[in-house]
Amino acid sequence: MIKIYLDEADQSHLTSISKNAATKPEWLRVKAPQFERIGNTASLLSDLKLNTVCQEASCPNIGECFASGTATFLIMGPACTRACPYCDINFDRSKRDLDPTEPHRLAEAVSRMNLKHVVITSVNRDDLDDGGASQFFQCVSEVRKKSPETTIELLIPDLCGNWQALELVLDSKPNVLNHNIETVKSLYRKVRPQGNYQRTLDLLKRTKEYFPSVYTKSGFMLGLGESDDEVLNLLSDLKNHFVDIVTIGQYLSPGPKHLPVQRFVSPPKFTYFKLFGEDNLGFMQVVSSPLTRSSYHAEEIQKLMKKYPR
């Protein structure tokens, strides 16, 4: 039976849906960024010709993260070979060569920024035989050389179900392997037409089976038309496929050509899903709030690694 931790006064918010989903509620407003500190991070990234998912995907937390000197690096170019209708990253299906200098430049950025924890992600590169696995491997290797104390989190695509490519990624020995499931099963064809719900779950399970000591992570969005029961079932599926950490955030439509927001989920509802995941299912951590994104405050994983050493 699900434990309920919310006061009666908060219960009414659990199923509240905005009548005008185009109008953001108060809790989705972000603080004005500190432009000087943002400029320092942006300048460094520009000098080293590096992309970030913060910029390419129009993340609402870019001000906070850049101001604190952190960023999620986006490797293998700023354009994706898929055109998911929720995503703001550019689309390009053409075959493109990888830049062999990218791993070195990324490692230099990590060193200059003195990062204790780095998140490396990529666009989908379905034009590559290994989906970009070898580039992930090289990036981890170069970061380890220049910053051996830095913990590394990889946020990878599904690699088209190429399990040999997945093993190559895992052979680089990241501290955290993240692959986002993004939405509930019933919405997959609509939200991720080139993805596959079960393939994502299989990737997460195979990750833990091949590399048991890695911390596994996945995330998804609310507000695309899912029901609360579907969210609970999704959390159960992730737990049954050996996921340690989950992130849950509000979907925000990038523009009129993208999927519209179906509802704005209130903060108490996010808390409800967090407590269900941690207390009922036993996840190591569920980070759940309207502005949560998969790499938001990712550096806090180091606290979990100390609490749950492997």
From Swiss-Prot:
Positions annotated to bind [4Fe-4S] cluster 1: C54, C59, C65, S295
Annotated signal sequence range: none
SUPFAM superfamilies listed in its UniProt record: Radical SAM enzymes
Residues binding [4Fe-4S] cluster 2: C80, C84, C87
Subcellular location(s) of the protein: Cytoplasm
Pfam entry (one): Radical_SAM
Residue ranges of every copy of the Radical SAM core domain listed in the record: 66-284
Entry's EC annotation: 2.8.1.8
Gene Ontology CC terms, in alphabetical order: cytoplasm
Matches recorded under InterPro entries: Aldolase_TIM, Elp3/MiaA/NifB-like_rSAM, Lipoyl_synth, rSAM
The organism's place on the tree of life at top rank: Bacteria
Enzymatic reactions: [[Fe-S] cluster scaffold protein carrying a second [4Fe-4S](2+) cluster] + N(6)-octanoyl-L-lysyl-[protein] + 2 oxidized [2Fe-2S]-[ferredoxin] + 2 S-adenosyl-L-methionine + 4 H(+) = [[Fe-S] cluster scaffold protein] + N(6)-[(R)-dihydrolipoyl]-L-lysyl-[protein] + 4 Fe(3+) + 2 hydrogen sulfide + 2 5'-deoxyadenosine + 2 L-methionine + 2 reduced [2Fe-2S]-[ferredoxin]
Obligatory cofactor(s): [4Fe-4S] cluster
Keywords (A to Z) from UniProt: 4Fe-4S, Cytoplasm, Iron, Iron-sulfur, Metal-binding, S-adenosyl-L-methionine, Transferase
UniProt-recorded Gene Ontology molecular function terms: 4 iron, 4 sulfur cluster binding; lipoate synthase activity; metal ion binding
Cofactor note: Binds 2 [4Fe-4S] clusters per subunit. One cluster is coordinated with 3 cysteines and an exchangeable S-adenosyl-L-methionine.
SMART domains: Elp3
Known pathway: Protein modification; protein lipoylation via endogenous pathway; protein N(6)-(lipoyl)lysine from octanoyl-[acyl-carrier-protein]: step 2/2
NCBIfam families: lipA (TIGR00510), PRK05481.1 (NF004019), PRK12928.1 (NF009544)
HAMAP family linked to this entry: Lipoyl_synth
Family assignment from sequence similarity: Belongs to the radical SAM superfamily. Lipoyl synthase family.
Protein name, per record: Lipoyl synthase
Organism listed in the record: Prochlorococcus marinus (strain MIT 9215)
Taxonomy of the source species: Bacteria, Bacillati, Cyanobacteriota, Cyanophyceae, Synechococcales
Gene from which this protein is expressed: lipA
